[in-house]
Amino acid sequence: MRLNVEMAKIITQIYEVQKPAEAKQLIEIGVDHIGSVIVSEDNWKIPLIKETVENIKETASKSSLIPLFKKQEIIFKILDYYSPDIVHFCDDLSNHNNVKENYEDLLHLQKNVKEKFPEIMIMRSIPIVQSGRTETVSTIKLAQIFEPVSDFFLTDTLLTAKSNASTDQQPVNGFIGITGKTCDWDIARKLVKSSSIPVILAGGISPDNVFDGITYVRPSGVDSCTATNAKDENGGLIRFKKDFEKIKRFIKKVRSAEKEINTA
């Protein structure tokens, strides 16, 4: 059972950071995990991201890298090239009926990564339905399947249709994340209690709700992407560009929640 009654420092994790200058600012602000994304297996070698990862390695922060593709051969190449602290897999696990045999390819990939790159930690996104929707995926069962080959779990929001049926309309087809929608915190709290590895709370986490998320779910860390993005002149969110004032507020709220829990 894992419930962080006596909590150490809560991990702060920010995605999607693709440039060294942005990473430098996040390090100065005090972000613990700084995540980048490789969006194409045809164009996976990106010197700016490599420089970003290398610069993070020289600090107390850790780099995390998401590959938005599944070919083991290409994933091994990017791990060789970038050498991140963490590789983060965020496949949509919701359409495999929660049967272990249906996840053998993904489990095999994670086992192989652990064998070939023992210095790289593995983060696995676990889908949780959007707040207010009927549970359509067995989050806890999925976590039990992947826990032996993972170092961290990250909760993320699975978009479902209004009928509560699963939908393929995730922002990136075949993967979960960057929805800007809050996941069901009751399920996330159950995952924290049942998991023997650290759980990072993600899914619509912002400076406005992160305090409540931490004090209710009691995760080991919190992750923000969409809600800490910059906005254009029309108020639209800009992917791959961060709003550093939002992130400063985010960090301040995290440390306040951390203090609240540790002194309760």
Predicted regions and their residues:
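Short, well-ordered alpha-helical microsegments
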Residues: 20-23, 72-75, 106, 207-211
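C-terminal helical cap(s) of enzyme catalytic domains, especially alpha/beta-barrels
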Residues: 48-56, 97-113, 165-173, 225-264
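Glycine-rich beta-to-alpha transition loops that act as phosphate-gripper elements at the mouths
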Residues: 10-19, 66-71, 125-132, 201-208
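A C-terminal functional module that forms or caps the active site or interfaces directly
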Residues: 200-218, 229-232
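Glycine-rich phosphate-binding active-site loops on the catalytic face of alpha/beta enzymes
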Residues: 31-44, 88-98, 152-162, 216-247
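Conserved anion-binding
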Residues: 38-42, 57-80, 84-196
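Basic, often amphipathic N-terminal segments
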Residues: 2-60
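Conserved, mostly hydrophobic/aromatic
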Residues: 26, 87, 153, 184, ...
